[in-house]
Amino acid sequence: MAFDGTWKVDRSENYEKFMEVMGVNIVKRKLGAHDNLKVIIQQDGNNFTVKESSTFRNIEIKFTLAQPFEYSLADGTELNGAWFLQDNQLLGTFTRKDNGKVLQTTRQIIGDELVQTYEYEGTESKRIFKRG
């Protein structure tokens, strides 16, 4: 699958504002904007393994498409949700455990980049990754 591989964050759009709307404090927002995130994605049929490594943490997430699972963001925000594959895009719908609000996430390959889009409470952000 096209998502397989190692991806390093190259640039972000509106990411600090997105983190602010998510309730991340200013210190963590400033640090998060420069986290040097690297993502390794491996797909085996409907099963995915995603390894994230950054300045703040290293984590491995395993999930099966369309199957709910729990996940914690780098700031500790806990979510429940699932990923779906549609039109060569990974679409994630996650609900925050603390307030019940929904975070939408999309991962898609555009050209030679992995574009990850977040939408929360009307605020959209993108993180663009290059193979690395």
Curated annotation (Swiss-Prot):
GO MF terms held by the record: long-chain fatty acid binding
Family label: Belongs to the calycin superfamily. Fatty-acid binding protein (FABP) family.
One Gene Ontology cellular component: nucleus
Organism field: Xenopus laevis
Modified residues (N-acetylalanine): A2
CDD domains xrefs: FABP2
Protein name, UniProt field: Fatty acid-binding protein, intestinal
Pfam families: Lipocalin
Binding of tetradecanoate, residues: W83, R107
Keyword Acetylation: yes
GO BP terms: fatty acid transport
InterPro entries associated with the record: Calycin, FABP2, Fatty_acid-bd, ILBP, Lipocln_cytosolic_FA-bd_dom
PANTHER family (UniProt xref): FATTY ACID BINDING PROTEIN
Acetylation is among the record's keywords: yes
